């Protein structure tokens, strides 16, 4: 089933428009959308009910109301999420959280980043990398740090579309590629 991108943006923009734009509130909505995503992907009963064209709309609404009530979702956002089911677009629950996070990042001028290093990175080095990358791309970056011994040395830094690969592993691959041309 194909997902309608225009509908995605419309729903996300409506959610953002009808909510308090505090970081705390937007993070709460993001976590609710994460839970709906997980529920949609992992709970076959939930998925079958909201996607089944033969299930009554009343049953679908009751299910959504119970789930959203249990999650503590306010009335305005609940109406929007129930409208998704009424519009027969429930398949967007599996991706809605990603689009919402992207729009929230745009709203706050932040970018998710990742540092994959061959060794443990201390806080001072992380802050130094963060300040350099933020000055390069002009946005605030929230990094997740991972260790990967297969890099041998160095690191791979990703922030939005900005990628720096200084790992020994990639250097050796480039060297191998260059030498194999001769």
UniProtKB/Swiss-Prot annotation:
Bilayer topology: Peripheral membrane protein
UniProt keyword list: ATP synthesis, Cell inner membrane, Cell membrane, CF(1), Hydrogen ion transport, Ion transport, Membrane, Transport
GO cellular component: plasma membrane; proton-transporting ATP synthase complex
UniProt GO MF annotations: proton-transporting ATP synthase activity, rotational mechanism
Cell compartment(s), UniProt: Cell inner membrane
Signal peptide range in chain numbering: none
Domain of life: Bacteria
Keyword Cytoplasm among record annotations: no
UniProt similarity note: Belongs to the ATPase delta chain family.
Biological role: F(1)F(0) ATP synthase produces ATP from ADP in the presence of a proton or sodium gradient. F-type ATPases consist of two structural domains, F(1) containing the extramembraneous catalytic core and F(0) containing the membrane proton channel, linked together by a central stalk and a peripheral stalk. During catalysis, ATP synthesis in the catalytic domain of F(1) is coupled via a rotary mechanism of the central stalk subunits to proton translocation.
NCBIfam families in the cross-refs: ATP_synt_delta
Subunit structure: F-type ATPases have 2 components, F(1) - the catalytic core - and F(0) - the membrane proton channel. F(1) has five subunits: alpha(3), beta(3), gamma(1), delta(1), epsilon(1). F(0) has three main subunits: a(1), b(2) and c(10-14). The alpha and beta chains form an alternating ring which encloses part of the gamma chain. F(1) is attached to F(0) by a central stalk formed by the gamma and epsilon chains, while a peripheral stalk is formed by the delta and b chains.
Protein name: ATP synthase subunit delta
Source species of the chain: Sulfurihydrogenibium sp. (strain YO3AOP1)
GN (gene name): atpH
């Amino acid at each position: 089933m194909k997902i309608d991108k225009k509908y995605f943006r419309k729903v996300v923009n409506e959610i953002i428009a009808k909510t308090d734009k505090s970081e705390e509130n937007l993070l709460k909505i993001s976590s609710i959308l994460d839970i709906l995503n997980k529920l949609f992907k992992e709970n076959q009963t939930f998925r079958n009910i909201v996607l089944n064209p033969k299930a009554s709309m009343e049953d679908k609404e009751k299910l959504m109301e119970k789930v959203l009530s249990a999650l503590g979702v306010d009335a305005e956002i609940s109406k929007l999420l129930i409208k998704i089911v009424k519009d027969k677009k429930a398949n967007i629950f599996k991706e809605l959280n990603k689009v919402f996070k992207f729009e929230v990042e745009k709203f706050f001028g932040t970018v998710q980043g990742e540092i994959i290093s061959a060794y443990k990175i201390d806080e001072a080095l992380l802050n130094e990398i963060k300040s350099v990358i933020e000055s390069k791309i002009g946005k605030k970056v929230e990094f997740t740090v991972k260790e990967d011994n297969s890099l041998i040395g160095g690191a791979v830094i990703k922030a939005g579309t900005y990628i720096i690969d200084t790992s020994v592993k990639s250097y050796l691959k480039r060297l191998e590629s260059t030498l194999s041309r001769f």
